[in-house]
Amino acid sequence: MKVRIAVVGKLDGFIKEGIKHYEKFLRRFCKLEVLEIKRVHRGSIEEIVRKETEDLANRILLGSFVMVMDRRGEEVSSEEFADFLKDLEMKGKDITILIGGPHGLNEEIFAKAHRVFSLSKMTFTHGMTVLIVLEQIFRAFKIIHGENYHY
């Protein structure tokens, strides 16, 4: 299974270290790819969001299950997320996870999404969202394989 996370914005050094940490743990479960999508700085907020969303959409893996992370999405437990991931794994599906920048995402991307998830009603930076998503993916695979995930 391939998991691609496309995120708007440059990721800080400590976030990149966290990504390396989870890449090491996830290596035996999936092939992970994290793509930084350049932020747009010119134009109205609406134009910026449209362009950033378009750039994200262009990074969707062909034939993959598309997940969007958005505070308006569905909140699920770690066990429910593990069941969801197991189902995709059994179907042989790759996953593309899209994370917007500070101004959010254009509504058009939600039409491309198969599912929209929320980590919380709180708002997180795009970098922290990446790390939390990676932790939940790792936790889900540990649950799927019946391994202890409290480390």
From Swiss-Prot:
The keyword rRNA processing applies. Its EC number is 2.1.1.177. Belongs to the RNA methyltransferase RlmH family. GO terms for cellular component: cytoplasm. PANTHER family: METHYLTRANSFERASE, RIBOSOMAL RNA LARGE SUBUNIT METHYLTRANSFERASE H. The keyword Methyltransferase applies. Specifically methylates the pseudouridine at position 1915 (m3Psi1915) in 23S rRNA. It catalyses: pseudouridine(1915) in 23S rRNA + S-adenosyl-L-methionine = N(3)-methylpseudouridine(1915) in 23S rRNA + S-adenosyl-L-homocysteine + H(+). It is found in: Cytoplasm. SUPFAM superfamilies: alpha/beta knot. It comes from Thermotoga petrophila (strain ATCC BAA-488 / DSM 13995 / JCM 10881 / RKU-1). GO terms for molecular function: rRNA (pseudouridine-N3-)-methyltransferase activity. Keywords: Cytoplasm, Methyltransferase, rRNA processing, S-adenosyl-L-methionine, Transferase. S-adenosyl-L-methionine binds at G100, L119, S120, K121, M122, T123, F124. It is an enzyme of class 2 (transferase). Homodimer. This is Ribosomal RNA large subunit methyltransferase H.
